[in-house]
């Protein structure tokens, strides 16, 4: 996977099929990190493991005389968090939605709206930025759906647009643009999300990918949507991948327990 992603990066950013060690600049690793996490949508922990392998290869090349210098020895990449993904709860999502902005804060408001759209559709950053009118499909009942292939895996996603997503899409609509949403550079987007979190008073640190987890957990699974359906909407190749999102949350536990109590009362049973 590391070799394939490196080749993809070199083709996309250097317009070449390969690079020699002497052609590698010191910022090569950082650029690759931005490409892998931003444009491809890989987890930070996955990117970290790839960079570790690249540095090992460069060290071996220097030791064997294939490279004149020891490349990237002082370059450090964040390990990321490989634990279970975190999602915003209802309170945090409402705090984010309630934010108000002055006229000069249009970029910050746009970043908030794009993030909320991701929360209601489950689309990853790289897919969000590529969505266009051709990805909108109307079903027999007149409902609007997003239909696209994930850039990361190529797996087909079908997501019915909730009223909140439709409202945000209409707000961000611009006839002069082919894409459904305005383009925000990945680094700028992450910076805006940090500012939004602090402004809203949300304690949980979140990134672009938190929106995807929020869709899986708060918007769908906690509302009773079957995990098989959620898996299809997220573009997961197997349900097992989606099960990482399906851990029982306190809210879900309380709701299921309340349903159990109501069920036993209806049947005049005791627990």
Spans of features found by a protein language model:
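C-terminal catalytic core of Y-nucleophile DNA break-rejoin enzymes
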Residues: 82, 151-195, 207
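Short, basic (Lys/Arg/His-rich) helix/loop patches that form interaction surfaces
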Residues: 101-108, 174-179, 183, 190-232
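Basic, Lys/Arg- and aromatic-enriched nucleic-acid-binding interface segment
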Residues: 42-44, 48-50, 67-125
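C-terminal catalytic core of tyrosine-transesterase DNA break-rejoin enzymes
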Residues: 116, 120-127, 212-237, 244
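Conserved tyrosine-mediated DNA breakage-rejoining catalytic core shared by Y-recombinases
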Residues: 74-77, 82, 90, 121, ...
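Catalytic-site neighborhood detector that most strongly recognizes the C-terminal catalytic loop/helix
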Residues: 87, 150-154, 166, 234-259
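C-terminal secondary-structure termini that scaffold catalytic or DNA-interacting sites
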Residues: 175, 259-271
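N-terminal DNA-binding recognition helix of tyrosine site-specific recombinases/integrases
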Residues: 2-12, 19, 39-73, 124-126
């Amino acid at each position: 996977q590391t070799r394939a992603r490196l080749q993809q990066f070199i083709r996309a950013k250097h317009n070449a099929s390969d690079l020699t060690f002497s052609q590698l600049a010191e910022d090569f690793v950082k650029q690759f990190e931005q490409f892998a996490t931003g444009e491809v949508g890989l987890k930070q922990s996955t990117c970290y493991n790839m960079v570790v392998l690249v540095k090992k290869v460069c060290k071996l090349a220097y030791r064997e005389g294939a490279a004149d210098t020891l490349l990237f020895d002082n370059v450090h990449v964040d390990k990321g968090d490989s634990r279970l993904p975190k999602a915003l709860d209802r309170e945090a999502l409402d705090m984010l939605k309630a934010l108000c902005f002055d006229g000069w804060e249009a970029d910050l408001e746009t970043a908030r709206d794009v993030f909320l759209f991701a929360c209601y559709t489950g689309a990853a950053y790289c897919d969000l930025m590529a969505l266009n009118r051709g990805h909108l499909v109307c079903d027999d009942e007149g409902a609007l759906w997003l239909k696209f292939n994930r850039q990361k895996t190529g797996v087909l996603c079908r997501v019915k647009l909730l009223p909140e997503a439709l409202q945000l899409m209409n707000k961000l609509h611009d006839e002069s643009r082919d894409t459904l949403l305005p383009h925000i550079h990945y680094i700028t987007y992450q910076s805006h999300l940090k500012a939004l979190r602090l402004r809203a008073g949300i304690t949980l640190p979140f990134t672009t990918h938190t929106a995807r987890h929020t869709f899986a957990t708060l918007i769908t699974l906690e509302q009773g949507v079957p995990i098989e359906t959620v898996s299809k909407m997220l573009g997961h190749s197997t349900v097992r991948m989606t099960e990482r999102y399906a851990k029982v949350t306190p809210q879900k536990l309380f709701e299921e327990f309340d349903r159990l109590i109501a069920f036993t009362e209806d049947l005049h049973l005791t627990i």
